[in-house]
Amino acid sequence: MALLDFFLSRKKNTANIAKERLQIIVAERRRGDAEPHYLPQLRKDILEVICKYVQIDPEMVSVQLEQRDGDISILELNVTLPETEESKS
């Protein structure tokens, strides 16, 4: 019976490992598909508008799109503005 238990338990572990791997693959694909094709152009356009008013480094602008509950999309924009001459004194 120990031999039979060995083979049966091994199949169970293999199935669990395969299931976990598939869950990881599905999660990675969902995360990769979450970014729409227009996001890089949107970031560029936002950067151009900000540069009309404030001179900043392009790396100081971060645009991220987050999906929640399937129906909700959150666009997060972070801009680090340089210090002004008035605030330095």
Swiss-Prot record:
Gene3D superfamilies, alphabetized: Cell division topological specificity factor MinE (3.30.1070.10)
Swiss-Prot/TrEMBL GO biological process terms: cell division; regulation of division septum assembly
Signal sequence range: none
Family listed: Belongs to the MinE family.
UniProt lineage: Bacteria, Pseudomonadati, Pseudomonadota, Gammaproteobacteria, Enterobacterales
Transmembrane segments: none
Known role: Prevents the cell division inhibition by proteins MinC and MinD at internal division sites while permitting inhibition at polar sites. This ensures cell division at the proper site by restricting the formation of a division septum at the midpoint of the long axis of the cell.
Keyword Ligase (UniProt): no
Protein name: Cell division topological specificity factor
InterPro entries, per database record: MinE (IPR005527), MinE_sf (IPR036707)
Keywords: Cell cycle, Cell division
Pfam families: MinE
Tagged with keyword Cell cycle: yes
